[in-house]
Amino acid sequence: MTDQRPSLEIRLCGPRGFCAGVDRAIQIVVLALKKYGAPVYVRHEIVHNRYVVEGLQSRGAIFVEELHEIPAEHRDQPVVFSAHGVPKSVPADAEAKNLFYLDATCPLVSKVHKQAMRHQRLGRHVILIGHSGHPEVIGTMGQLPDGAVTLIETVEDARSCHFDDENNLGFVTQTTLSVDDTAGIIEELQARFPNLSAPAAESICYATTNRQDAVRSAAPGCDLFLIVGAPNSSNSKRLVEVAEKAGARMSMLVQRAADIEWDRIGDISVVGLSAGASAPEIIVDEIIDAFKARFNVKIELAETTVETENFLVNREIRDVELTVQDMAFVNGEHRVVGIPKLMPKIIQGK
């Protein structure tokens, strides 16, 4: 019987999905649960993805907004800080409450914290390029005293900002920003403040840059570009913007296959597909399956680089072994209930 489904090319971007920092953060919660038992408390979403959060909840993690929400009878259980980083006041509060905590801050976010503190130590007022209210921005600003950091969100902000000492300024950036948009803000700041000091190393992380490069490469000629990610995921929203600017006719952010607006899509022959750094691979598979149910799909890999970065987990939990099923869950390849769909792609101790 002839296949009557229309043909569709899916350009599957690589790299996509979980980065080393997200892998590490999820591992920390899983390892803590295995070593200390449930419940393990997590301050804020460990990463911006409900699928991951719900999977960890099913294993015994309890998510809270602030430390005072942890019941007195559970104060001997560990609490994990999210991958986005926290202000200095949070670990200080944990110590005051005699809580045992594990910091899952991405090492690349911690690097930005150190860059900001170095600027201040050298007598510079710190300019932070980022999005107001994002947990990473709150964490970075919370490394320094009130008034020591000015947040710049747009080129317009860069044009209108003023400082008491324009010769002693240094900037850092949120790690998940659009590379192109950030370049425009930095260019404007450098034009206005020629003595502006840059960080010793790039603030935007390798995973953000790599995912944007892959989307930029795949987008021209796409009728539709889907980005798997949460609405509160900064790096995922930037990928939607990159796809549109790079030539995709339409770009959408979806959390699950059920979010795809089939009626809005219309006639399509080429679809781009990528995932933000906190989106699990199993949802990418789910979306491909949804297209296969409607189209005769041909998948083309649009890979621009291969990532090999690995980050160690906290010393306190390195003695715990993960099973194959644990590792598949950490990699986003494992449904909350059931057996692993794919073999793991990480090494324990990463």
UniProtKB/Swiss-Prot annotation:
<feature type="binding site">
    <location>
        <position position="48"/>
    </location>
    <ligand>
        <name>dimethylallyl diphosphate</name>
    </ligand>
</feature>
<feature type="binding site">
    <location>
        <position position="134"/>
    </location>
    <ligand>
        <name>isopentenyl diphosphate</name>
    </ligand>
</feature>
<keyword id="KW-0479">Metal-binding</keyword>
<feature type="binding site">
    <location>
        <position position="205"/>
    </location>
    <ligand>
        <name>[4Fe-4S] cluster</name>
    </ligand>
</feature>
<feature type="binding site">
    <location>
        <position position="48"/>
    </location>
    <ligand>
        <name>isopentenyl diphosphate</name>
    </ligand>
</feature>
<keyword id="KW-0414">Isoprene biosynthesis</keyword>
<feature type="binding site">
    <location>
        <position position="134"/>
    </location>
    <ligand>
        <name>(2E)-4-hydroxy-3-methylbut-2-enyl diphosphate</name>
    </ligand>
</feature>
<feature type="binding site">
    <location>
        <position position="235"/>
    </location>
    <ligand>
        <name>isopentenyl diphosphate</name>
    </ligand>
</feature>
<dbReference type="Pfam" id="PF02401">
    <property type="entry name" value="LYTB"/>
</dbReference>
<comment type="similarity">
    <text>Belongs to the IspH family.</text>
</comment>
<feature type="binding site">
    <location>
        <position position="234"/>
    </location>
    <ligand>
        <name>(2E)-4-hydroxy-3-methylbut-2-enyl diphosphate</name>
    </ligand>
</feature>
<dbReference type="GO" id="GO:0051745">
    <property type="term" value="F:4-hydroxy-3-methylbut-2-enyl diphosphate reductase activity"/>
</dbReference>
<dbReference type="GO" id="GO:0016114">
    <property type="term" value="P:terpenoid biosynthetic process"/>
</dbReference>
<dbReference type="GO" id="GO:0019288">
    <property type="term" value="P:isopentenyl diphosphate biosynthetic process, methylerythritol 4-phosphate pathway"/>
</dbReference>
<feature type="binding site">
    <location>
        <position position="234"/>
    </location>
    <ligand>
        <name>isopentenyl diphosphate</name>
    </ligand>
</feature>
<feature type="binding site">
    <location>
        <position position="235"/>
    </location>
    <ligand>
        <name>dimethylallyl diphosphate</name>
    </ligand>
</feature>
<feature type="binding site">
    <location>
        <position position="19"/>
    </location>
    <ligand>
        <name>[4Fe-4S] cluster</name>
    </ligand>
</feature>
<feature type="binding site">
    <location>
        <position position="84"/>
    </location>
    <ligand>
        <name>dimethylallyl diphosphate</name>
    </ligand>
</feature>
<keyword id="KW-0411">Iron-sulfur</keyword>
<feature type="binding site">
    <location>
        <position position="48"/>
    </location>
    <ligand>
        <name>(2E)-4-hydroxy-3-methylbut-2-enyl diphosphate</name>
    </ligand>
</feature>
<comment type="pathway">
    <text>Isoprenoid biosynthesis; dimethylallyl diphosphate biosynthesis; dimethylallyl diphosphate from (2E)-4-hydroxy-3-methylbutenyl diphosphate: step 1/1.</text>
</comment>
<keyword id="KW-0408">Iron</keyword>
<dbReference type="InterPro" id="IPR003451">
    <property type="entry name" value="LytB/IspH"/>
</dbReference>
<feature type="binding site">
    <location>
        <position position="106"/>
    </location>
    <ligand>
        <name>[4Fe-4S] cluster</name>
    </ligand>
</feature>
<feature type="binding site">
    <location>
        <position position="278"/>
    </location>
    <ligand>
        <name>dimethylallyl diphosphate</name>
    </ligand>
</feature>
<dbReference type="GO" id="GO:0051539">
    <property type="term" value="F:4 iron, 4 sulfur cluster binding"/>
</dbReference>
<feature type="binding site">
    <location>
        <position position="84"/>
    </location>
    <ligand>
        <name>isopentenyl diphosphate</name>
    </ligand>
</feature>
<comment type="function">
    <text>Catalyzes the conversion of 1-hydroxy-2-methyl-2-(E)-butenyl 4-diphosphate (HMBPP) into a mixture of isopentenyl diphosphate (IPP) and dimethylallyl diphosphate (DMAPP). Acts in the terminal step of the DOXP/MEP pathway for isoprenoid precursor biosynthesis.</text>
</comment>
<feature type="binding site">
    <location>
        <position position="84"/>
    </location>
    <ligand>
        <name>(2E)-4-hydroxy-3-methylbut-2-enyl diphosphate</name>
    </ligand>
</feature>
<keyword id="KW-0560">Oxidoreductase</keyword>
<feature type="binding site">
    <location>
        <position position="175"/>
    </location>
    <ligand>
        <name>(2E)-4-hydroxy-3-methylbut-2-enyl diphosphate</name>
    </ligand>
</feature>
<feature type="binding site">
    <location>
        <position position="278"/>
    </location>
    <ligand>
        <name>(2E)-4-hydroxy-3-methylbut-2-enyl diphosphate</name>
    </ligand>
</feature>
<feature type="binding site">
    <location>
        <position position="134"/>
    </location>
    <ligand>
        <name>dimethylallyl diphosphate</name>
    </ligand>
</feature>
<dbReference type="GO" id="GO:0050992">
    <property type="term" value="P:dimethylallyl diphosphate biosynthetic process"/>
</dbReference>
<dbReference type="GO" id="GO:0046872">
    <property type="term" value="F:metal ion binding"/>
</dbReference>
<feature type="binding site">
    <location>
        <position position="233"/>
    </location>
    <ligand>
        <name>dimethylallyl diphosphate</name>
    </ligand>
</feature>
<comment type="pathway">
    <text>Isoprenoid biosynthesis; isopentenyl diphosphate biosynthesis via DXP pathway; isopentenyl diphosphate from 1-deoxy-D-xylulose 5-phosphate: step 6/6.</text>
</comment>
<feature type="active site" description="Proton donor">
    <location>
        <position position="136"/>
    </location>
</feature>
<protein>
    <recommendedName>
        <fullName>4-hydroxy-3-methylbut-2-enyl diphosphate reductase</fullName>
        <ecNumber>1.17.7.4</ecNumber>
    </recommendedName>
</protein>
<keyword id="KW-0004">4Fe-4S</keyword>
<feature type="binding site">
    <location>
        <position position="278"/>
    </location>
    <ligand>
        <name>isopentenyl diphosphate</name>
    </ligand>
</feature>
<feature type="binding site">
    <location>
        <position position="233"/>
    </location>
    <ligand>
        <name>(2E)-4-hydroxy-3-methylbut-2-enyl diphosphate</name>
    </ligand>
</feature>
